[in-house]
Regions:
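Periplasmic alpha-helical coiled-coil/stalk elements that build and connect Gram-negative outer-membrane
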Residues: 2-6, 129-246, 349-352, 356-359, ...
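Acidic, low-complexity, intrinsically disordered peripheral segments
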Residues: 3-6, 30, 404-466
């Protein structure tokens, strides 16, 4: 019953603040309108950091190809031109063409471990990319709400400046009429100056937030943006324990950590293979043509099965095994640490979300009451019944109440997004579609990078000469 009542209070409060603050959103001319959904899709389709992570898939796939190739047939061709002269013999000259093929029959389990490790690595690379997409989504959400929150706080500070400016004019008129002391004029001027400084800080915070958002979206860093999505209160009914259980099942970075543990176990198997023999099948053929002292041609075909066994290496193999076992145990502990971090971070974000929810509920009537208090204090002062301190206190209380309401509202939105991210909530279908548009490195980009490197090197050399 209490939670349902609080939910209704939050919904009404969110709606009221959204309506009151939407009227004050800055709307620069010729700015690009951007919803939160559009911002997320743009980032998933163009973020440079995400492109870097995605390239790791190519690297992992290439490593898997190498591992499979080492367990398959390899062939070599050679051509040798030879000349020799021995004492009391005629000079000899010949040319030999050779072709050989080699197939590993048994590697002690090393090749098989390498292949399985490569397969796990390729899958882990894809999981890492997907987790990077989820993290990027959260970063965009947080940056978007940071910018919207900053824009609303600008209006609070601008309203404060306007009120202090109007009050200063009123006090000046009263002072000129002999109804107020000069100290009231001076104090009002100081408060106006302080309010203007707070406005400058708020405007800078907004500019920094937009710069962060543009960087995530990888758009023109001077692009004017109009953020059009209004945050709406969405109840979150999942318990913290259920959130943690969900995260243990769905966090992709935890899956990557577990996969790394398996790869370390395979590395132990690979190191132990050094104690076992290796068996290889080799087939070869060759043609030798002799030019001096006479012309002659001969061919040969060979087949062999070779066994190699490292019976003593002064402890090198034993050391490799111990190193691999240590790395395996480190990976095991890293999985445990990752699980503990998930638990802690989720609990912190969850508690912060609930705290922001309660703060917003408690600020529901504070803004209305602060406005009424300011109006009363201002009218009492104009009538000569109040003192300047009453107006200053009332204005400070009003600005604080407005700022607290805005902060609580956007803190809740950010912490909710963080909780969902820490749970490992997957992307939507439309977000996956946007992520599929992420481009690989193009030939034009490589050429431009090479040109920039050459130009930069030339400039550096020229400066060194000077």
């Amino acid at each position: 019953m209490y939670r349902e009542k609080r939910r209704r209070q939050c919904c009404r409060a969110f709606a009221a603040l959204a309506l009151s603050t939407a009227l004050f959103m800055p709307l620069p001319a010729h700015a690009m309108s951007l919803t939160l959904t559009e911002a997320i899709d743009m980032a998933l389709a163009s973020n440079t950091g995400l492109r870097i992570t995605a390239e790791g898939e190519r690297s992992a796939d290439a490593a898997l190809k190498q591992a499979r190739g080492k367990n398959s047939i390899s062939a070599e061709a050679g051509d040798t031109l030879r000349t020799s002269k021995s004492k009391d013999e005629d000079a000899q000259a010949s040319n030999t063409l050779s072709l050989s093929a080699r197939l590993p029959l048994y590697s002690g389990g090393a090749n098989e471990a390498n292949i399985e490790s490569g397969e796990i690595g390729a899958q882990s690379a894809r999981l890492t990319t997907e987790r990077a997409r989820e993290d990027l989504k959260y970063e965009v959400i947080a940056a978007y709400w940071d910018a919207v929150e900053a824009s609303k706080k600008i209006e609070v500070q601008r309203d404060t400046v306007n009120k202090y400016d109007a009050h200063l004019k009123n006090v000046t008129v009263l002072y000129d009429a002999g109804a107020q002391a000069k100290i009231d004029v001076l104090r009002s001027s100081v408060e106006l100056s302080n309010a203007r400084q707070e406005l400058v800080r708020a405007e800078n915070t907004y500019a920094v937030s937009l710069a962060t958002l543009r960087n995530l979206l990888n758009i023109d860093r001077t692009e004017e943006l109009t953020l059009t999505t209004e945050v709406a209160y969405q109840p979150f009914d999942t318990s913290v324990d259920n959130c943690i259980s969900y995260a243990y099942r769905n966090r992709l970075d935890l899956a990557v950590a577990r996969a790394k543990l398996r790869r370390c176990e395979l590395a132990v198997e690979r190191a132990r293979a050094g104690k076992r023999p290796s068996v290889n099948l080799t087939l070869g053929t060759g043609v030798t043509s002799q030019f001096q002292p006479r012309h002659d041609t001969s061919t040969d075909v060979s087949a062999s099965v070779g066994v190699s066994w490292n019976i003593f290496d002064s402890g090198v193999t034993r050391g490799a095994i111990e190193e691999a076992e240590a790395e395996r145990d480190i990976a095991l502990l890293n999985v445990k640490k990752e699980e503990e971090s998930i638990d802690l971070n989720l609990r912190k974000a969850y508690l912060n979300m609930r705290e922001a929810e309660q703060r917003f509920t408690s600020t529901g009537d504070a803004v209305r009451q602060a406005r009424e208090d300011y109006h009363i204090a201002n009218e009492r002062y104009r009538a000569g019944e109040g003192i300047l301190l009453d107006i200053i206190d009332a204005q400070t209380a009003l600005a604080t109440a407005q700022t607290n309401a805005i902060s609580a509202r956007y803190d809740y939105a950010r912490y909710r997004a963080q909780v969902e991210n820490l749970m490992g909530t997957e992307l939507t279908e439309s977000e996956h579609a946007a992520a599929e548009r992420l481009p690989a490195v193009t030939a034009e980009e490589r050429a431009a990078a090479q040109a920039a490197y050459i130009e930069g090197g030339t400039d550096a050399a020229a400066k060194k000469v000077k």
